[in-house]
Amino acid sequence: MISLFSYSKNPVKQWGQLQVKGNQLCDQTGDPIVLRGVSYGWHNLWPRFYNKQSVKWLKKDWKCTVLRAAMGTVIEDNYIENPEFALKCMNKVIKAAIKNDLYIIIDWHTYYPQKEEAKAFFSMMAQKYGKYPHIIYEIYNEPMEDSWESVKEYATDIISEIRKYDPDNII
């Protein structure tokens, strides 16, 4: 019962490199854990929250152990139209999560595959942040009208790209 309500002040230091065993998220020793946290809204709709102060506050006040940085690929100022702005927002939160010893989900938040753009993005993220055990990749947030075959093909390609640079973090 204690593990259900446990909180880690420094989750990455305590749990280390995450792994999946069966259907369980586990710490570096193979013990099941539960991460607790929140998702930022799309970077292009709520950029004012993409800063180090919000990360620190969510850790301290909400006792988060994980955050999710949702990078929008549709609507104005999205990654496809304005990658510099998107990366600036994402990098602020990712760097702050690492500094504050939190896990961070890098989320490709879209309704459409955009495979080539996603491959380039995740290649960049894996090269930059793949050495940190804080990272979790979410490669396609909301497939809407895609067939299983197309989602599987997309996922296989994106996972292969990430694994070129990051063999360990959870996807």
Question: Can you say where each PLM-predicted feature lies in the sequence?
Answer:
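Active-site mouth of glycoside hydrolases
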Residues: P11-I170
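Bacterial Sec-dependent N-terminal signal peptides
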Residues: M1-K9
